[in-house]
Amino acid sequence: MTASVVLLDTNVVLDLLLARKPFDKDAVAIASAVARGELVAYIAATSVTTIHYIARKAIGTLEADRAIGRLLLLFQVAPVTEHVLSTALARAFSDFEDAVLDAAAELVSVNALITRDAQGFTLSKLPVFTPAAFLRAMSAR
């Protein structure tokens, strides 16, 4: 079976990295599926800087640097190019960050977006799942 290819929203990666209860359980399960090769997951390049900024405030600069290093070993990075930004600007999303993630996801041809903010992606052409819903769909295959 071919592995699914997904893009993780920033909030899901922060749940994993900062062990944010009760959301961390699903984030850990998704990361474990990636580590086992059952899933390919991207994070957007812009998410990396946001994740570092928030993590640095919570766990300090050195630990945030180490955490980013681990994330880069586990996840692929979806580029945020001028084309991605222009595409995002042309979309009618209410949140520009969500539009950027959606356009980056399309650029790398993912099968789905995984987010805790599914309402932010109602205009996406891609299937959008919460982490829990994605895990249920994965286990049903």
Where are these regions (language model features)?
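Short, well-structured N-terminal submotif of metal-dependent ribonuclease cores
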Residues: 1-43, 56-66, 123, 129-141
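Alpha-helix capping/helix-boundary segments
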Residues: 12, 47, 84, 100-101, ...
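Short beta-strand segments at enzyme active-site cores
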Residues: 43-45, 115
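Short, well-structured alpha-helical segments
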Residues: 65-69, 85-86
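Active-site neighborhoods of divalent-metal-dependent phosphate/nucleic-acid chemistry enzymes
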Residues: 73-118
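Short acidic-hydrophobic, aromatic-tinged amphipathic segments that line or gate anion-handling sites
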Residues: 78-80, 128-131
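Short, structured coil segments at secondary-structure junctions
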Residues: 109, 124-125
